[in-house]
Amino acid sequence: MGEVKHLQINYKTDELFADFREFGNKNLYMIEELKGQMIDASSDSPFYGIFVGNKLVARMALLDKGEVEETYFPNSNYYILLWKLEVLDTYQRRGYAKQLLNFAKENKKPIKAIARNNSKAFFLTQGFKDVATKNPEGHDILIWNP
């Protein structure tokens, strides 16, 4: 299995994400986010991925939130928003999502995730807790504490 790599934001990033647009949820495309960040090549990329050969097969964004999330993490000044965890169809069920999630957990900060595309059961098996609340789009909110 490949290692998790920090993805830089540059002209190639859109090419790397092209396969995800062909099958995925349009809310996960990251097009506008990329365009906004490509302007400043020095910006710190929140994107991480796993390659098989030269092909990006799994990706996610980790957004470090500095404000206190009183509702879910009252004892923490920082948490991570795990955003857009996605694995290409032909590479699913091979452990790539779990590998990305374990990479996020290595930060030893609380994590907040939104369960989209029937991913709630996966997050629950990985130690996340259902907070019995939905985001404005109707997706379940899950949290993980170190």
Curated annotation (Swiss-Prot):
InterPro entries assigned to the protein according to its UniProt record, in alphabetical order: Acyl_CoA_acyltransferase (IPR016181), GNAT_dom (IPR000182), YlbP (IPR017274)
E.C. numbers: 2.3.1.-
Keywords: Acyltransferase, Transferase
Top-level division of the source organism's lineage: Bacteria
Protein name as catalogued: Uncharacterized N-acetyltransferase SERP0741
Annotated ranges, domain N-acetyltransferase: 7-146
Enzyme class: transferase
GO molecular function (one): acyltransferase activity, transferring groups other than amino-acyl groups
Organism placement in taxonomy: Bacteria, Bacillati, Bacillota, Bacilli, Bacillales
HAMAP family linked to this entry: Acetyltransf_YlbP
